[in-house]
Amino acid sequence: MAAQEVLLVTTPEPTALVDAYAMVKVVHLRDSQKPLWLLINNAQNQEEAEETIEQLQSATKRFLNRELNVLGMLPTDPFILQAVRQQRGVVDLFPQSPAAMALHAAARQLQEKIPLQKDGFAAFWKGLSTEGL
């Protein structure tokens, strides 16, 4: 994989959790050292997001002996549907909406925790050339 970090976005639905775990497993088998970040989308509340995180963390720890870096959650937000209908980003169209605020918080957290790499683009191309498309 050419990416140096992996951001996994999933929802609380059981089928989505199965898919998310499958993706974690694929990434882990290809590169067990690659950092994995988890963001829960469309959570009804903080409790639902935390339960979802715990379920995925538990399976990942138990079967892969691996921890996920948790970014947090994006709440269910009616402004997202409005933005989709207008074919615009929720952050641009409704910057004060709960989803936009949560996206900003997740982006800030990523910025703080992932060092900016000056050779990021070069590393990307090197990854493509050595790992294939």
Where are these regions (language model features)?
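Inter-motif core of Ras-like GTPase G domains
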Residues: 1-15, 24
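G-domain G4 guanine-recognition motif of GTPases
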Residues: 11-12, 36-51, 73-80
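Conserved C-terminal guanine-recognition region of P-loop GTPase G domains, centered on the G4
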Residues: 17-36, 45
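Signal for well-folded cores of large energy- and translation-related assemblies
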Residues: 25-28, 44, 61, 75, ...
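Short helix-capping segments at alpha-helix termini
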Residues: 31-32, 61-67
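Beta-strand-loop-alpha "switch" segments that mediate conformational coupling across diverse proteins
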Residues: 64-89, 103
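NTP-binding/hydrolysis catalytic cores, primarily Walker-type P-loop NTPases
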Residues: 89-133
